[in-house]
């Protein structure tokens, strides 16, 4: 990364960092060095470079192999606060630097100008990690056989990559010799533990067996610059097309202070058959028993090849590496190729961290699992592998990072190698941090307060939903990344010659990313519209059924109303009406016969009985008193008439007349005992009023009803 040197003007650097926050500090520092701290020249150059980081497809202008190697450098080193200063950029940022390298071989920041490591993370100038480190201090405290972790192994620096126990030295393949060892200045404050993880892509896609890469951090020195670095590289398939790019315009200074002793990287145990024996020392057979055991060779069918290390997306791999004591932003949006990490509204929090959490007993483990690929994604969800000793970052962290862009994508400026049959798609990494107790800082670096902790990082393919969530997070961030078509960006992305690949050649990948994002957006919109259309169709069908039901009910009501007015009676109804009519006629005939029978018996006049009270005079006219022999006859006749009328109302046949006659005969028989002396006979017989015919008590002289006198 870019180190602060006396040639840099801190004020100009600060102004440029404020003006171009999307450009990493290393690139800004290199621009200042090239332009001799000229603010205007740096502004012009950085304004041209800013779009590369805005559209997140940065590549070196002379890098004609942008699809081949995408180096992801995960820095796990620790540093002391005294060595931290703002000019160091990502070198002293707590060891969490993601580095984009255009080099093709092993990581060699000083081997050639084109192999400089470009800072990918722009770290804020916050409180650095507080670590008390010694020159020979190994932060991972992992012992080899009969050798302490703090003792530097006696390995000559002529081997840039050395395998330890568990490697099969004859399993390496590839003719490319190791690059010359880099020269670094030794700063004893740093304890470097390099972990170079290179995963191979040129594996047959039919293999689905899980493979594991075990990395044992037992060497307290670093080959590649920053302390405790982990480099994850994806390179192309053909080694014939390996080219060393020319000097990049933004060259960075050496990665970090590295001691010259023990130039051995951490061991890699993939148990495969494609290694370079020239790059790995067979004498490192000193750790037969390690803290972690890799699976047998049958389960690890060569996931890695030495010259070009790429991972097949459809296969599963495991990488075990120790954690770093620093923290990372929770949701930064970053992509690997542009060497740019968007800070947005998130800031990197540096939490105080002491070496006590990295003591021997507290050996922590990070497990990186590469899952089978689901679909080509345009961004990866990368989460922080390092941890902090505070419980604040124990939740799920998600970063969106894109490594190598798909080599099968259109308008990609590649001329020196054939296109692979599959595309190198971004990797989707999720990080789950265990919920164990946090390490308590202690003054002694050897004190262990917590047991072994395992950190799992799952590497898979980014799905559509992940990109949608990424867009949602970008909407909530301070500076969302614009997506513009290729027509907006100057230069054509379809150029095939590497000499034409200037700054504007990133427009091809921009156009591809824009196309992918547009397709994803349109697909999501189409799905949403299809769902809405389905709901509308269901609602339409429901309304149609309701309308049909209402129309049917209306028709039924109309039919019932019409049938009530003009309906022809049924034969049953006609028969019923005919029988009722016949019954009425029978009743009328019976009534007439009864009337004729009663009329033939005497002075029974129904008309006179109905109008009886109309013939009564209004005044107290006393009728002439009837004779004694006829006095009883009217009463008897009247009683008979009353009884006959009542009987005729109840019975409606001819036999009623016989019953009436029998009743009349019975009445005559009942009147015969009344003639016998009873109590009433002593008082006298009741008398009928001549005016109102009311039957009065014999003791009364006036009528009880009309007050007419009994006798005139």
UniProtKB/Swiss-Prot annotation:
There is a cross-link at residue 649 (Glycyl lysine isopeptide (Lys-Gly) (interchain with G-Cter in ubiquitin)). Changing residue 649 to R: Almost complete loss of AMFR-induced 'Lys-27'-linked ubiquitination. Gene3D superfamilies: DNA helicase RuvA subunit, C-terminal domain, Zn-finger domain of Sec23/24. Residues 163-173, 336-345, 371-404 have a biased composition (Polar residues). GO terms for cellular component: cytosol; endoplasmic reticulum; endosome membrane; extracellular exosome; plasma membrane. One of its GO terms (molecular function) is K63-linked polyubiquitin modification-dependent protein binding. Residues 627-636, 658-667 have a biased composition (Basic and acidic residues). Ubiquitinated; following IL1 stimulation or TRAF6 overexpression. Ubiquitinated by AMFR via 'Lys-27'-linked polyubiquitination; leading to TAK1/MAP3K7 activation. Degraded in a lysosome-dependent manner following interaction with TRIM38. InterPro entries: CUE, TAB2/3_CUE, Znf_RanBP2, Znf_RanBP2_sf. GO terms for biological process: defense response to bacterium; negative regulation of autophagy; non-canonical NF-kappaB signal transduction; positive regulation of canonical NF-kappaB signal transduction. Residues 322-332 have a biased composition (Pro residues). Changing residue 692 to L/M: Abolished Cys methylation and ability to bind 'Lys-63'-linked ubiquitin. The modification Phosphoserine is found at residues 60, 101, 103, 385, 409, 492, 506. The modification N-acetylalanine is found at residue 2. It comes from the Eukaryota. Interacts with TAB1, TAB2, MAP3K7, TRAF2 and TRAF6. The minimal TAB3-containing complex (TAB1-MAP3K7-TAB3) appears not to contain TAB2. However, it seems sensible to consider that TAB2 may also join this complex and may act in a cooperative manner with TAB3. Interacts with DYNC2I2 (via the WD domains). Interacts with RBCK1. Binds 'Lys-63'-linked polyubiquitin chains. Interacts with TRIM5. Interacts with TRIM38 (via B30.2/SPRY domain), leading to its translocation to lysosomes and degradation. Interacts with ASB1. (Microbial infection) Interacts with M.tuberculosis PtpA, which blocks the NF-kappa-B signaling pathway. Adapter required to activate the JNK and NF-kappa-B signaling pathways through the specific recognition of 'Lys-63'-linked polyubiquitin chains by its RanBP2-type zinc finger (NZF). Acts as an adapter linking MAP3K7/TAK1 and TRAF6 to 'Lys-63'-linked polyubiquitin chains. This is TGF-beta-activated kinase 1 and MAP3K7-binding protein 3. It comes from Homo sapiens.
